[in-house]
Amino acid sequence: MYKIGLTGGIGSGKSRVADMLAEWGASVIDADEISHALTAPGGAAMPAIAREFGPQAVAADGALDRAWMRDLVFREPTARGRLEALLHPLIGLHTEQAAAQARGLYLVFVVPLLVESGRWRGRVDRICVVDCDPATQIARVQKRSGLTEPAIRRIMAAQAARATRLEAADDVIVNDGATSPDTLRARARTLHDRWLALAGAASQPGGKAAGTPE
């Protein structure tokens, strides 16, 4: 199946784009949703997280205490790597299981840290970045989450720089503060149609998909 890696900084609108692609028939696998399920009450990652970070990492309902973890990552630079070492193998396993069951027109992996991970380029046929300016990112995240601007900037600082994401992109969907919902939908539809054509070509004899040797 033809594979798209969809990414973008926090607040860029990649989830909105993913919802549109799913509406049009793509199979969408969201790494963030998998991560949240793994760290929800009873999630598969929670026993290992409790062992690694102690009971203070677990909220009263048994989920990951995200506010506590954000603060720890800010104070202790190694904490992010320790958490990712626990989560990433599980996310990878669940991602592969979901991909094996996908039956859509093509497959979309929504991965916030796709560019940063370095391992996705060989797993997808194209990388699409949903792009917007930092001020718009901050405003959107503040509106939906109530996080302070310094907290949002810390999250942004842990992600790839905007220029780095754009350099890695095969396709870009601009979703800045001036982009209306209709305009965003039109931009996403243009790429959806392009990917459908590419998926069709890749499925023909002699066509190529990600991971296929030259």
Curated annotation (Swiss-Prot):
GO terms for biological process: coenzyme A biosynthetic process. InterPro entries: Depp_CoAkinase, P-loop_NTPase. GO terms for cellular component: cytoplasm. It catalyses: 3'-dephospho-CoA + ATP = ADP + CoA + H(+). ATP binds at G11, S12, G13, K14, S15, R16. Pathway: Cofactor biosynthesis; coenzyme A biosynthesis; CoA from (R)-pantothenate: step 5/5. Belongs to the CoaE family. HAMAP family: Dephospho_CoA_kinase (MF_00376). This is Dephospho-CoA kinase. It comes from Bordetella pertussis (strain Tohama I / ATCC BAA-589 / NCTC 13251). The gene is coaE.
